[in-house]
Amino acid sequence: RKKIADFLFNREKTFHFTAEELNKIINKKDNLEKISLATIYNTIDAFKKAGHLKEILTNNNKSFYDTNVSSHHHFFDIETNELEDINYNDIKVVNLPHAPKGKKIQDVEVTLTVKKS
């Protein structure tokens, strides 16, 4: 876990990734001890539950993870499978429906799907 945490959280910019991408990067970076995909998923899940990662589900049902856990939106490029942050205040969401009975809206995050024009 420490090796994964160091890689994810000791960087200047936020990082968007899938579990499979992280597995390839981590295992290519250090040839000494390979980390299994199951360990990657378990570690991601632990970081998610602790509030250190955010999961973004794209329209192709692929889970990406984000080291930026503050409220913000995303562009998702369907051709490159890459996410790019959008400042939270750059999108105004109006006329939200009422939350189901007994529930309240906690947050609104928008993912805009893009492709080359």
Give the residues covered by each predicted segment.
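Short capping segments at the starts of secondary-structure elements
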Residues: R11-T18
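DNA-recognition alpha helix
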Residues: T18-N31
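Non-DNA-binding regulatory cores of transcription-related proteins
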Residues: A50-S117
